[in-house]
Swiss-Prot record:
Pfam families: RRM_1
Record-given protein name: Splicing factor 3B subunit 4
Annotated Gene Ontology cellular component terms: precatalytic spliceosome; spliceosomal complex; U2 snRNP
Keyword Nucleus tagged: yes
Family: Belongs to the SF3B4 family.
UniProt-recorded Gene Ontology molecular function terms: RNA binding
Compositionally biased region (Low complexity): 202-231, 293-302
Subcellular location: Nucleus
Length: 359
């Protein structure tokens, strides 16, 4: 899996992260480790068929000092309620480990059965892996990795040729990736023992340094305490799984703001569309009213044709005392005083008025 890494990376500035949860992604590791130091790249080896990682990742920094600082700061960090293991990558790494090959497995044997069966011999580093085909059917063999050769030797002696789910299994050391040699050789055991002693010495040094640092902190001056408080702290840890930091919060806030802006724009567009539709409806109504008025006028003109003038001509102004004759309206009859009726009641009392006196 590690052979898929690009060879031009800086091994001195690279960290190896193990025991990762399947939910961990490269972007999440980038956001986590960039809080400690500038990150060049993050690589998680994945299986070609399943596209799932085995819990390992590589994080490359700009310099070895950045990698060492991130190694100190990111210890005891938990991702998805699972503590991760971090260490420096070794360029001259050799495929060393108490890795076992279990063959002739029954189809009913799964990872849980293997773990429950072999965990009594020692600590299992990784979850036992049963090899399966594309349909999820077991191929009949699996791999188990112990933390020591004593545990793997005990497992071989106790479980080789033993029945597991109605089939006798074969337990041997697995072959190495780059050669046909098997694990468990004397040279490999010597190298593993030297590494274990070196790891124990490192742990003792770390414990002694931690105790000395606690004593110095208790006797430090206020100025030293202020300097220590000004140093960057590790990111906050959430025990329920996952890490919350400022970058994620800012990204979420930015996304929420963008969504709100998009909603506001959509609402404005909807309002504009509604206004345009209302204006169009009003224009259509006005046009319909005008058409109706025109139709009514046409109907009235058809019912009263004598009011229409075939030849337009100006109407003369009427006379003050009598109307001017009009070609369409006959003039009134002439005045005839004989036709007037005498009404004595209209006269004053006593008959006719007396004549005026002579002067």
């Amino acid at each position: 899996m590690a052979s898929n890494l690009p060879q031009e990376r800086n091994h001195e500035a690279c960290l190896l992260i193990r025991d990762l949860d399947p939910m961990v992604t490269e972007s999440l590791l980038m956001e986590l480790f960039i809080q400690a130091a500038p990150v060049v790249k993050v690589f998680i080896p994945k299986d070609k068929l399943t596209q799932q990682h085995s819990g390992r990742a590589y994080v490359e920094f700009q310099s070895s000092s950045d990698a060492e600082y991130a190694l100190k700061v990111m210890k005891f960090v938990r991702l998805f309620n699972k503590e991760i293991k971090i260490k420096k990558e070794n360029k001259d790494k050799v495929d060393i480990g108490a890795n076992l090959f279990i063959g002739n497995l029954d189809a009913d044997v799964d990872e849980r059965i293997l773990h429950d069966t072999f965990s009594r011999f020692g600590t299992i580093i990784f979850t036992p892996k049963v090899m399966r085909d594309e349909n999820g059917v077991s191929k009949g063999f699996a791999f188990i990795n112990f933390d020591s050769f004593e545990a793997s030797d005990a497992a071989i002696e106790a479980m080789n040729s033993q029945f597991l789910c109605n089939k006798p299994i074969s337990v041997t050391y697995a072959r190495k990736k780059d050669s046909n040699e098997r694990h468990g050789s004397s040279a490999e055991r010597i190298i593993a023992a030297s590494r274990n002693t070196g790891y124990l010495n490192q742990q003792q040094q770390q414990q002694s340094s931690s105790t000395s640092s606690t004593s110095t902190i208790s006797t430090s001056t206020p100025q030293q305490q202020q300097q220590q408080q000004s140093q960057p702290l590790p990111p906050p840890i959430v025990t329920a799984g996952g890490i919350i930091h400022q970058q994620q919060i800012q990204q979420q806030q930015q996304l929420q703001q963008q969504q709100q802006q998009q909603l506001q724009l959509q609402q404005l567009q909807l309002q504009q569309l509604q206004q345009q539709q209302q204006q169009q409806q009003q224009q259509q109504q006005q046009q319909q009213q005008q058409q109706q008025q025109q139709q009514q006028q046409q109907q009235q003109q058809q019912h009263h044709p004598h009011h229409q003038h075939p030849i337009p001509h100006p109407h003369p102004l009427p006379h003050q005392l009598r109307p001017h004759p009009h070609p369409h309206h006959p003039p009134p009859p002439p005045f005839n005083p004989m036709l007037m009726q005498f009404n004595p009641m209209m006269m004053p009392f006593g008959g006719m008025p007396p004549p005026p006196p002579h002067k």
